[in-house]
Regions:
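A glycine- and charged-residue-rich anion-binding loop/surface
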Residues: 1-405
């Protein structure tokens, strides 16, 4: 028995009664419900499935979490079974349907705009829960992206008529379709948007409005090169408002933190970046001075051109000190430092230094339970900083030559 697909013939009808044709268990511990008619749009053509409820007096409202088409009929995924032959009430989530229809009609308008203005063909369309993307076969500039967005929104504001009709596939070559598909056969659904000399016409199985105004707004969120063309991420209507509300809140929070107005955030961040760069430069200079002082001190304390020490510096400074010490061709060093919750080490030697840094790393790893390694010339690693590892380190440093050489 064929299913009457109200989402195609009467898309404004979001609720109806229907007779249960079948209800079979599925592999997801739920049931696939088939009815003789349905207002639910099944996922397809890039558009997400409707969700909603199915109601009967015995079970109340049972959620419909997904719909899909199989063998020409629509199956509704539910968590409870229904008896064959019983009459149920199907109700689509109106807010979700509005959001999805806004995205789909908006996608037609945006794709049409880039086709008319730049001859860019839509070669991919995907609707997710929070964004929509189209893939174009041309890589467009920022200015071209904005021009297409403006063109599409002007079509929305004109409240242009949208006409939906069916034709036989044999008639398709005679129609000014935006996209050609020679594989189609039988009856084909066409969605047409009036646009003067550039009428938008495309094959489509999705839900659409009867005019463009309900799309509300089309906003491009980002675009990037993709394969040989570009991928455009956008949102329409309710979804566009959700994005604006979230991003505006973030902008105002950032502006408040910087003590500026929202339109002054970029300049304020640029000033902060300049300040940070200046402070980083001063820090590098101080670290270099500190490394020089530690290097001189450690070099003086070394025995037989070798030093092992636990230093109160970060790992970058530790590496700099090791490099400075080992500028002496005959010198070797094993230096340790604390960084956050880890104990880190670096072993290094000059060109003629006696320390085998790879072997030293293996010994340190075994003693501290550390992970690391390297070459005979340099090695490094780390382990969690605990009372036990710090005690082990004190034991290593008490007889470094014996423990590391």
């Amino acid at each position: 028995m064929s299913c009457e697909k109200l989402y195609l013939t009467a898309p404004e009808m979001l609720e109806c009664t229907a007779r249960v044709v079948s209800c079979t268990p599925n592999k997801n511990d739920g049931y696939d419900l088939e009815t003789d008619r349905t207002p639910f749009f099944p996922e397809g053509g890039g558009q997400l499935s409707d969700i909603g409820t199915v109601y009967d007096p015995m079970q109340g409202f049972v959620p419909v979490t997904h719909c899909f088409e199989a063998n020409g009929t629509v199956l509704h995924r539910t968590g409870k079974p229904f008896a064959v032959g019983e009459i149920v009430t199907l109700k689509v989530d109106a807010a979700k349907r509005l959001k999805y229809t806004q995205q789909h009609t908006g996608e037609h308008l945006l794709s049409h705009a880039y086709d008319v203005l730049f001859g860019a063909e839509n070669v991919g369309f995907h609707m997710a829960g929070d964004v929509v993307t189209i893939d174009l076969d041309h890589n467009l500039s920022d200015e071209e992206i904005e021009a297409g967005e403006k063109y599409a929104n002007e079509l929305v504001w004109k409240n242009a008529p949208v006409r939906i009709f069916n034709v036989d596939a044999s008639e398709l070559p005679n129609l000014p379709l935006r996209k050609k598909n020679e594989k189609l056969h039988g009856e084909v659904r066409i969605v047409e948007v009036e646009d003067g000399d550039h009428t938008e016409m495309c094959t489509c199985c999705g839900t659409h409005f009867m005019s463009t105004a309900p799309v509300g707004l089309i906003k491009v969120l980002e675009h990037a090169r993709y394969k040989s063309g570009c991928r455009i991420t956008f949102a329409c209507g309710v979804l566009a408002l959700e994005h604006f509300t979230k991003e505006n809140a973030e902008l105002r929070r950032t502006a408040a933190a910087l003590s500026v107005k929202p339109d002054g955030v970029f300049d304020a961040l640029a000033r902060k970046e300049e300040q940070v760069q200046g402070l980083n430069q001063k820090l590098r200079e101080k670290n270099a001075q500190l490394a020089k002082l530690y290097s001189e001190k450690l070099h003086a304390e070394a025995q037989e051109n070798f030093i092992a020490a636990h230093l109160p510096v970060d790992f970058d400074a530790c590496k700099t000190i090791a490099e400075t010490l080992c500028a002496d061709d005959n010198f070797s060093a094993a230096l340790f430092c604390n960084e956050s919750d880890r104990l880190r080490y670096i072993c290094a030697r000059g060109k003629n230094g006696a320390l085998d840094c790879r072997a030293a790393a293996q010994k340190i790893n075994a003693l501290l339970g550390a992970k690391g390694g390297g070459s005979p010339v340099t090695s490094q690693g780390s382990c969690p900083k605990t009372a036990e590892t710090e005690q082990k380190l004190r034991e290593i440093l008490s007889e470094p030559v014996q423990n590391l050489n």
